[in-house]
């Protein structure tokens, strides 16, 4: 049944489609017939064109004013301007400024080249045309070595170049142009574990933690997860008993002027894969090695016999001493030649004049003593009286008595401090106590 119904439906659809096609053909035939009739009528009117022309001319004169109002003004067509019209200045008032507003805004943005051809440039194309070359940008700057090739592509390259070359401006880190995340490389996998500074190692905190019960890998394995979480929330107090006097001395006496071995200078930015450990070792070696000494291995490599100065010392006669070592004394140049013994050919001898200047400086935050100016004033007074012949014996006796008394106090204080230090060295206190 279903198949018969579907067959009937398909037959009906085919009949409908055939009827639609027949109707379309009939409509097309009717349209063609109408067109032929209109063409025939047009031929008749053309034959009567001579009689109708007179009538049309009369009607045009009568309805000329009316038809002009309904004509569309063509503003897009360019008009030829004569020489007389160029000299005449005509002011045109727009009746419909809203219609022409879009065109005027576009005309203002467009650049009018010398050829007279209007070309519209986008902001990107304009930036490319106005982009300076690398040589031009470097010539405008006092430090051209700072300028890179990508600085020319900036929105304001001149401003960027002037900012980069100003004093105390830290450069942008180089990882801004890398697509991967900062410090996401594998170089951090081989990073050394953290080590305590030497000054904190003096408190023996590492030994103390290693002697605690359940310390190390075995202790961590024995601890359960619940015990570890409980120890974080509620730690046991008194497990580490430090000698707080030594801890105070580490930070306030021994470590008052302490600083790390290697500190990055101002503007030296850390970058990925930078090995600071090797840099610290190199700086430590440079600080340890001093000029004025040459090893036997270097003498053998240079084929330099003993008792002969290195070749760079001969150059120093013409050029002068290095600016980094102004107090350097070299045998045969500014030092006696008899001091050339073995591996030593020079020595850094600091100038006493510069040292006295450093000692005489007054630093900010120094304690002001009210006793020393009195003694200095009294000395100056006695010298002035001796020169002028008006020396007073009473003042000299008082000054000598005060100086003797002051020196005795200083000697007593120093002796007391030495005794305390000796007692501490003899009886060393235990830095910690292990509580089980």
Swiss-Prot record:
Listed Low complexity bias regions: 12-22
Composition skew (Basic residues), residue ranges: 1-10
Family matches, as SMART domains: PSP
Cellular component annotations (GO), alphabetically ordered: catalytic step 2 spliceosome; nucleus; precatalytic spliceosome; Prp19 complex; spliceosomal complex; U2 snRNP; U2-type prespliceosome; U2-type spliceosomal complex
Composition-biased stretches (Basic and acidic residues): 389-408
Residues modified as Phosphothreonine: 104, 112
Keywords: mRNA processing, Nucleus, Phosphoprotein, RNA-binding
Quaternary structure (record): Belongs to the CWC complex (or CEF1-associated complex), a spliceosome sub-complex reminiscent of a late-stage spliceosome composed of the U2, U5 and U6 snRNAs and at least BUD13, BUD31, BRR2, CDC40, CEF1, CLF1, CUS1, CWC2, CWC15, CWC21, CWC22, CWC23, CWC24, CWC25, CWC27, ECM2, HSH155, IST3, ISY1, LEA1, MSL1, NTC20, PRP8, PRP9, PRP11, PRP19, PRP21, PRP22, PRP45, PRP46, SLU7, SMB1, SMD1, SMD2, SMD3, SMX2, SMX3, SNT309, SNU114, SPP2, SYF1, SYF2, RSE1 and YJU2. Interacts with RDS3.
Described purpose of this protein according to its UniProt entry: Essential splicing protein required for U2 snRNP binding to pre-mRNA during spliceosome assembly.
Protein name: Cold sensitive U2 snRNA suppressor 1
Gene: CUS1
């Amino acid at each position: 049944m279903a198949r018969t119904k579907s067959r009937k439906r398909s037959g009906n659809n085919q009949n409908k489609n055939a009827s639609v096609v027949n109707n379309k053909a009939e409509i097309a035939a009717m349209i063609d017939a109408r067109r032929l009739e209109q063409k025939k009528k047009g031929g008749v009117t053309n034959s009567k064109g001579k009689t109708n022309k007179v009538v049309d001319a009369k009607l045009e004169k009568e309805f000329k004013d009316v038809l002009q109002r309904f004509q569309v003004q063509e503003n897009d067509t360019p008009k030829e301007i004569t020489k007389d019209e160029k000299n005449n200045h005509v002011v045109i008032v727009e009746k419909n400024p809203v219609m022409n507003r879009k065109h005027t805004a576009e005309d203002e943005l467009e650049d009018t080249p010398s050829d007279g051809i209007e070309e519209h440039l986008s902001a990107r194309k304009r930036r490319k045309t106005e982009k300076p070359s690398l040589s031009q940008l470097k010539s405008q700057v006092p430090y051209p070595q700072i300028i890179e090739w990508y600085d020319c592509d900036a929105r304001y390259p001149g401003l960027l170049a002037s900012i980069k070359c100003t004093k105390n401006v830290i450069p942008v880190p180089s990882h801004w142009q890398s697509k991967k995340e900062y410090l996401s490389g594998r170089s951090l996998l081989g990073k050394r574990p953290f080590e305590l500074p030497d000054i904190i190692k003096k408190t023996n905190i590492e030994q103390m933690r290693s002697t605690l019960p359940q310390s190390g890998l075995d202790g961590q394995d024995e601890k359960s997860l619940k015990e570890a979480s409980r120890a974080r929330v509620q730690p046991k107090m008194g497990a580490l008993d430090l000698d707080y006097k030594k801890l105070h001395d580490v930070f306030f006496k021994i470590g008052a002027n302490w600083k790390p071995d290697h500190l990055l200078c101002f503007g030296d930015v850390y970058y990925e894969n930078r090995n600071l450990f090797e840099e610290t070792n190199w700086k430590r070696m440079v600080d340890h090695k001093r000029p004025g000494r040459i090893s036997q291995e270097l003498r053998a490599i240079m084929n330099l016999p003993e008792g002969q100065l290195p070749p760079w010392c001969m150059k120093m006669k013409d050029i002068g001493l290095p600016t980094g070592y102004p107090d350097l004394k070299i045998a045969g140049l500014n030092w006696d030649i008899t001091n050339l013994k073995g591996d030593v050919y020079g020595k850094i001898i600091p100038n006493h004049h510069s040292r006295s200047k450093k000692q005489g400086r007054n630093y900010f935050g120094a304690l002001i003593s009210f006793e020393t100016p009195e003694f200095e004033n009294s000395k100056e007074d006695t010298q002035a009286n001796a020169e002028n012949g008006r020396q007073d014996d009473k003042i000299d006796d008082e000054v000598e008595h005060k100086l003797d008394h002051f020196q005795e106090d200083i000697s007593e204080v120093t002796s007391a401090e030495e005794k305390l230090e000796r007692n501490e060295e003899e009886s060393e206190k235990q830095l910690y106590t292990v509580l089980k």
